[in-house]
């Protein structure tokens, strides 16, 4: 299963600040940017590369690495919470082409944990994805029921990219299993997997509403 939980001391340190309800809006956004950059570098370890030879200023030839896939990256930003996360990803992939998807889910407040939520895509602008060439990275800080992500994946899978990556900060166990059971070939990168969802579909312990905490 291509699931990567990046639970290193530095990522968990940043995540702890994100979870803290006393972290202010500016620092919340900055920490999302920091994690986006780190997760981008982790993704780069799975991209195609070639061994090359270069000559140093001292006239000595040496072997090196050229990550060829750095020229074949498309980042899709699920508005609005993913904006700082994508800012960090772009620091790792400065040549990436970008797309945006605006999606909203119908809020629920029942007695039981929702297994699916109605999602409406109100805006979509995605660059052409080259089949079996481009690596598509879909960014969303929180994967709860995975209803939004599955809706976006329906669009991306049709383009038949080389690889599809999902980047999140916190994912629920339910959401991860739901995505990877339907699309077992997808690479899912997250910092933490939380065990529960509440009756509104929010992750517990989570970090609250990422969009509201980042932008008010």
Curated annotation (Swiss-Prot):
| UniProt pathway | Pyrimidine metabolism; UMP biosynthesis via salvage pathway; UMP from uracil: step 1/1
Q: What class of enzyme is it?
A: transferase
Q: Which cofactors does this gene product need? A: Mg(2+)
Q: Which GO terms describe its molecular function?
A: GTP binding; hypoxanthine phosphoribosyltransferase activity; magnesium ion binding; uracil phosphoribosyltransferase activity
Residues binding 5-phospho-alpha-D-ribose 1-diphosphate: 80, 105, 140-148, 209
Q: Which family does it belong to?
A: Belongs to the UPRTase family.
Q: What is this protein called?
A: Uracil phosphoribosyltransferase
Q: Which organism is it from?
A: Saccharolobus solfataricus (strain ATCC 35092 / DSM 1617 / JCM 11322 / P2)
Question: Which gene is the coding source of this polypeptide chain?
Answer: upp
